[in-house]
Amino acid sequence: LTNITTIIHSCSYSLKEPLSPHAAAEIEGITINPDTIKIPNSNHLLVEMAGGLMVPFNNEGYLFSDFLVQHKLPTVLVSRHYLGSINHTLLSVELLKKLKIPLLGIVFVGDEHKTTEAAIKKNANTSNFHRIPITSSLNTSFIEKEALKLKGSSFLKNI
C-alpha cells in the first residue's frame, strides 16, 4: 500500500452495514453469488474476509471457508485477544487442516498476551507468527510503519 506498484482491486460487493455478508446483503435486498467474485491474477494477492471462516456469504449455505477451498487460497489467520480467542483461533486452525487449506501464519492484533499466545503457538499448525498493534486511525503513516516492521521479517519470508 505504500508503493506505486500496489493495486487495490475493486470489491465485487460493497455492503453498507457492518454485519456478516449474508445479513448485510439481505438488508440491502441483494443476494451474493460467490461465482461472480473473480480472483485477480496477481503475484501477491490479499483477500480479506472479516469475521471468521464459518461466516456465510449468503443464505444458501456458502461460507468463507468454501470460497477458500474453491479458489485454493492459502490463509493467514488474524487473532485478537479476548475471552474465547484461544478456542476460536484453534478451531479455525483445525478447520483449515480438515479442509486442506494451507495455513501460512497467524497475526496477533493488539498487546502481547503471553499465556494466550503460548497456548495458540503450542497447538497451532504453524510456527509463523506476527503481531500488529491496534490503532484508532488506519492511515498511511501507520501502514508505512507496520510495513517496515514486516519487511524482511521471518513472518513475511515464510508466507
Which residue stretches match the model-derived regions?
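N-terminal phosphate/diphosphate-binding loop that engages ATP/GTP or pyrophosphate donors
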Residues: 1-30
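A general structural detector for well-ordered alpha-helical segments in enzyme core domains, enriched
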Residues: 36-37, 63-67, 92, 116, ...
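Switch II (G3) loop of P-loop NTPases
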Residues: 36-59
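Structural motif
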Residues: 46-48, 76-78, 107
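Inter-motif core of Ras-like GTPase G domains
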Residues: 58-82
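Class I SAM-dependent methyltransferase SAM-binding "motif I" and its flanking Rossmann-like core
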Residues: 85
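C-terminal lobe/tail of nucleotide-utilizing enzymes
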Residues: 93-159
